[in-house]
């Protein structure tokens, strides 16, 4: 074999080696180029899926928390309404009970007032009658004080015009000095409990 042939073979071998080496480099670099063009790694795909799963779960938990909050507010409002209703019912029951007591007590007060209206004047009282009359006056004073503490007020009558919301006319008389329907006398005192009439005043009015 001549030197020329050997040189050509050697050159050809080197050329083949270069081609093979170039092929190995291209084979190794192609996946890297493709990876950089948007392919995701398995680890990245797993992380993104987990994040999406957690976000979905967080949204569900927020929605559930909102429902619990709305339910809690509704129950709190229901309880507050129930409490206020019971307070109103208790106040109304207490007011009705007080009103019933006052209604039963008013005839006693009427009798005490009539007794004192017909009692002798202080200067005319005998030594025997004076202690009893003074005792009745003390009872009347205490009863009126108790009524005042409970918010009970007597209805103004004499000298005012008849008002059917507060007065009940039981008689009419001629009275030159009074206008028609003006109250000139009171037969029975009327009372208010707060702003509610618990007994109308029975009055006599001018024609």
Curated annotation (Swiss-Prot):
Main location: cytoplasm
Keywords from the named record: Chaperone, Cytoplasm, Stress response
CDD domains named among the record's database cross-references: GrpE
Alphabetical list of InterPro entries matching this protein: GrpE, GrpE_coiled_coil, GrpE_head
Disulfide bonds: none
Assembly information from the UniProt record: Homodimer.
Function: Participates actively in the response to hyperosmotic and heat shock by preventing the aggregation of stress-denatured proteins, in association with DnaK and GrpE. It is the nucleotide exchange factor for DnaK and may function as a thermosensor. Unfolded proteins bind initially to DnaJ; upon interaction with the DnaJ-bound protein, DnaK hydrolyzes its bound ATP, resulting in the formation of a stable complex. GrpE releases ADP from DnaK; ATP binding to DnaK triggers the release of the substrate protein, thus completing the reaction cycle.
Record HAMAP family: GrpE
Record protein name field: Protein GrpE
Lineage, opening ranks: Bacteria, Pseudomonadati, Chlorobiota, Chlorobiia, Chlorobiales
Gene this protein is translated from: grpE
